[in-house]
Amino acid sequence: MAVQQNKKSRSRRDMRRSHDALTTAAISVDKASGEKHLRHHVTADGYYRGRKVINK
């Protein structure tokens, strides 16, 4: 079993963990339908930037 040679300091541990934070998704509201969607993505209704781009 692998065992560390030297104890990692609190500083080293925290520096490693500095990249582990979660970020919230950038959610936008469509102008035409008022539906929430991810940025740069088409809504479920087929709208993108206020225009109908997909016909169902």
Curated annotation (Swiss-Prot):
Annotated GO CC locations: large ribosomal subunit
Keyword match Transport: no
BP GO terms, sorted: translation
Feature: compositional bias, Basic residues: 7-16
Molecular functions (GO terms): structural constituent of ribosome
Alphabetized Gene3D superfamilies for the sequence: Single helix bin
Keyword Ribosomal protein included in the entry's annotation: yes
The entry's keywords: Ribonucleoprotein, Ribosomal protein
Positions of transmembrane segments: none
Renumbered residue ranges of the record's region Disordered: 1-37
Pfam families the record matches: Ribosomal_L32p
Protein family according to the UniProt entry: Belongs to the bacterial ribosomal protein bL32 family.
HAMAP family on file: Ribosomal_bL32
Full protein name: Large ribosomal subunit protein bL32
Taxonomic source organism: Pasteurella multocida (strain Pm70)
Gene: rpmF
